[in-house]
Amino acid sequence: MRASASSAVTVVNAFATGVGSAIGIDLWTRAEVKLKGDGIEGEIRVRGEQVRDFRLVKAVADVFREKTGEEFGIKFRIESEIPIAMGLKSSSAAANALSKALADALGLDMSEMEVVKAGVEAAKRAGVTLTGAFDDACASYFGSLWVTDNLGMRVLHSSKVEPLPVVLLLPGKTLLTESLGGRDFSPIRPYVEEAVRLALEGEWRKAALINGLVYSTYLGHPIEPFRIALERGAVVGLSGKGPAVFAVTNEPEELAEEWEQFGKVLTTELR
């Protein structure tokens, strides 16, 4: 069985408050799953490069073994356009696509939200999320804007967004989510709470900027790309824990050209 899920960008990072917000974007991960007697085998390719970390695949299989009470093996293939360790929800997209493909292969009658929650559980077990990333998972699976209580696994707000152009800046370094375990985010909580309030009111542009500047400063990411984007009238934010920065702009080509001095640049759109 085949399934797909998309990347997303952050409106509010949940590290400080447990409440997160994200919007889907048009970069995709596709998974193919076949059942077999036992064991797990397959391959993962991200933007043409082979990845050998199968932790998430094993965790998804374990979640569904427990859900069904059955023992089974899987043969899988994952192809992804989403850069990893950049804050662009590559893990959420993979968990969603794998969970949907495996649920279909097993013939399970699951709602879409049940599939999403199974993927979140697998991501927690695999250690690729600190908060559960329920917001990222919803934005990845469904598209649109989502605000969620990640600790309580509750949807607080959801609304459609226009398919506006998005520019992604991918600096040379990467940052694994698990490397931030134990980091104290309480000093920035009051500022992130303001971003949450704005996101709940649908003011995602303002929320993304506040969140991005606060987390970028706290985590030591450069903010010069923010200044350049703001000068061009773009909506700009930090995606996840970074280092990826995104901008929603009506001048994607011009901003992309200016951002190339900081790293690799991709263009896509909201979904």
UniProtKB/Swiss-Prot annotation:
InterPro entries per the record? GHMP_kinase_N_dom (IPR006204), Ribosomal_Su5_D2-typ_SF (IPR020568), Ribsml_uS5_D2-typ_fold_subgr (IPR014721), SK_arc (IPR010189)
Keyword Kinase in annotation:
yes
* Reactions it catalyzes: shikimate + ATP = 3-phosphoshikimate + ADP + H(+)
The EC code for this enzyme is: 2.7.1.71
Q: Does the keyword Aminoacyl-tRNA synthetase apply?
A: no
Q: Which SUPFAM superfamilies match?
A: Ribosomal protein S5 domain 2-like (SSF54211)
Q: Which GO terms describe its cellular component?
A: cytoplasm
Gene Ontology BP term (one): amino acid biosynthetic process
This protein's source sits in the domain of life called Archaea
Its localization reads: Cytoplasm
Q: Which Pfam families match?
A: GHMP_kinases_N
Annotated GO molecular function terms are:
ATP binding; shikimate kinase activity
Binding site residues for ATP: P83, I84, A85, M86, G87, L88, K89, S90, S91, S92, A93
UniProt pathway:
Metabolic intermediate biosynthesis; chorismate biosynthesis; chorismate from D-erythrose 4-phosphate and phosphoenolpyruvate: step 5/7
Q: Which keywords appear in this protein's UniProt record, sorted alphabetically? A: Amino-acid biosynthesis, Aromatic amino acid biosynthesis, ATP-binding, Cytoplasm, Kinase, Nucleotide-binding, Transferase
Q: Which HAMAP family does the UniProt record give?
A: Shik_kinase_arch
Question: What family does this belong to?
Answer: Belongs to the GHMP kinase family. Archaeal shikimate kinase subfamily.
According to UniProt, the name of this protein is Shikimate kinase
Q: Organism source for this protein?
A: Thermococcus kodakarensis (strain ATCC BAA-918 / JCM 12380 / KOD1)
Query: What gene is behind this protein?
Result: aroK
